[in-house]
Each structure stands twice: as structure tokens, then as C-alpha cells.
From Swiss-Prot:
It comes from Drosophila erecta. It is an enzyme of class 5 (isomerase). GO terms for cellular component: mitochondrion. This is NAD(P)H-hydrate epimerase. Binds 1 potassium ion per subunit. Belongs to the NnrE/AIBP family.
């Protein structure tokens, strides 16, 4: 059976069912998702060669995954720096930000230029927009999306490369081209267009009954791994 790629409605339905039928909390799944993202980054971009990571966080759950990933990456020997242009005013996100601050993780207020990013970072973690994103990109995030479109640094995208349509994928030739895509729960339709070197699945929390209901046909995670190469 082939791995299923979810459309936007299916992705939302699976997410909601995890919360309602299976009684997972948002912070539970966010912690597991962000941790799996950190593991995928560590597999593809070892800290010895890519120690400095600019973590770009958006306003929703995708940004929360980025905050979690930054915290775990700091424990794995990386030096993450967070760019979070529009922090979400909810306790969960405020707590995640506070945890990063207490871990000594720095943040930047202004989006770095292409030149500044090249000088100060080895990798960009793109945690801006998730599967609820609908184009166009809002004003607060135009600068950081343009940075990712123009940079020569490798990019690791969380679930959806920023600016891509969740189902159609790239909308223009200058859209973000990540080297690593970490699909969460199950890959979305846009991932069929991914041409980068590394595609991983993370979020090892999907109950078998839910997998069967949606015919996800997820690959088997090896051993005790938190992510699996697709």
C-alpha cells in the first residue's frame, strides 16, 4: 500500500480527531512534533558542521513546533537563534518562549539580511506556516520568506515549506526550496513536489486505529527512532 499524502481537509480532520477522540493535548503533540524535527535536523545536518541555526517561527502551531525544536537542538549541541516576528499571546506559546529564554537561547528582533544570515548561521529552520496556511504571505512575514527564497544556506522546513500551497505546492519558481522537509503526522499533498535531498516523517504518535481509518499507510519507524526517512 502506498503512503497517503493528505489534502488540507484531511490534515485538519486527523489533527482534530487526535484532540477530540484520542484526548491528546496541543502541547503534548507539539512537544513530540518539535522533538522529532530536532532529531531529523541532527540526522541531516550534524552539529559539528551546522552548529548555528536561525529558527524562524510563525504565529501558529508550526511556530510552536519551531520553539520546541530550538530547545531540543540547544541540548544537542547546536546554537539556535530564534526569529519570532509575531509571538502568539497564548499561555502555551508564552511558556515555550520562556523555556527557550531560560535555556539561554537568544532571539533577534529584526529579520537578518541575506548577507547577515550567511555570516552568522549555518542552517535555517523554517517553522513559519503549517497546513492551515492560505496565500498570500502576510506583511509581518514577507521579509523572512524573502530571506529564505534568496539565501544559499540550507533550509529545513517543518511540515510545509513556507509560502507553498498545502495541496499544490510551489506557486512560483522563486518559492522556498528546502534541503530537508520534515512532514509531521503524515505528509501533505505539497510534499509530492519536494525535490530536496532529505524527506523525513516525524510525529510518532498516530494511533494504529487512526492510521487505519484514514488509510495513511505510514512507514514503520525503525527501533526507537522519532523520525523515519521517506
Amino acid at each position: 500500500m502506498d503512503l497517503k499524502y493528505l489534502n488540507q481537509k484531511e490534515a485538519i480532520d486527523v489533527d482534530q480527531e487526535l484532540f477530540t477522540e484520542y484526548k491528546f493535548s496541543v502541547d503534548q503533540l507539539m512537544e513530540l512534533a518539535g522533538l522529532s524535527c530536532a532529531h531529523a535536523v541532527a540526522k541531516c545536518f550534524p552539529a559539528e558542521k551546522h552548529p548555528r541555526i536561525l529558527v524562524c517561527c510563525g504565529p501558529g502551531n508550526n511556530g510552536g513546533d519551531g520553539l520546541v525544536a530550538a530547545r531540543h537542538l540547544s541540548l544537542m549541541g547546536y546554537t539556535p537563534t530564534i526569529y519570532y516576528p509575531k509571538p502568539t499571546a497564548k499561555p502555551l506559546f508564552e511558556n515555550l518562549s520562556h523555556q527557550c529564554q531560560m535555556m539561554g537561547i537568544c532571539g533577534v528582533k529584526e529579520c537578518p539580511s541575506v548577507e547577515s544570515a550567511a555570516a552568522n548561521y549555518d542552517l535555517i529552520l523554517d517553522a513559519l506556516f503549517g497546513f492551515s496556511f492560505k496565500p498570500p504571505v502576510r506583511a509581518d512575514f514577507v521579509a523572512v520568506v524573502e530571506l529564505m527564497q534568496q539565501t544559499k544556506l540550507p533550509i529545513a522546513s517543518v511540515d510545509i515549506p513556507s509560502g507553498w500551497d498545502v495541496e499544490k505546492g510551489k506557486l512560483t519558481e522563486c518559492d522556498v526550496e528546502p534541503a530537508l522537509l520534515i512532514s509531521l503526522t503524515a505528509p501533505k499533498l505539497c510534499a509530492r513536489q519536494f525535490r530536496g535531498e532529505h524527506h523525513y516523517l516525524g510525529g510518532r504518535f498516530v494511533p494504529p486505529a487512526l492510521q487505519r481509518k484514514y488509510e495513511l499507510n505510514l512507514p514503520v519507524y525503525p527501533g526507537n527512532e522519532l523520525c523515519v526517512k521517506l
